[in-house]
Amino acid sequence: MTDLRIGHGYDVHRLTEGRRLVLGGVEIPWDLGLLGHSDADVLTHAVMDALCGAAKLGDIGKLFPDSDPRYAGISSLELLRQVAALLKKGGWAVVNVDATLIAQAPKVGPCRREMEANLAAVLGVETDRVNVKATTEEHLGFTGDSSGMACHAVCLLMRL
């Protein structure tokens, strides 16, 4: 029997002035950015948590604690590289990743393909194995009033 594992990740960050908005390693021009210890890339964080969950590696808070100064301002793609190395060491291959960004603004559709390409490159998979979507919550809740952004991600891993 093939050993397959499904993982789910969720992340949320507050939007604030004076920070860059980075999603999937792409800097999005906007007047607000996500607040966090690293670059606060909510998309990449959700993807990492999905991958960690599927491989039983815990979560990114365990692997990259916000109390550790080594991770202050770090690119989340660099953290994803470290997760990808742990997956490889554990004998796991990424079958696919699917993520849904939740935000009222800005519109990220024009940058989706670049985000997918960045994530796929770090994970060492073809771009057709990574999908990024975006939706709003119709002005409801903290994402709807642009107080923050959220992201859900799922992945499928296969034991090599």
Language-model-derived ranges and their functions:
Residues T2-R113, N118, V122-L123:
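RNase III-family endoribonuclease catalytic core
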Residues E126-R129:
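Short acidic capping loops at alpha-helix termini that bridge into adjacent secondary structure
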Residues D145-L160:
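C-terminal edge-of-domain segments
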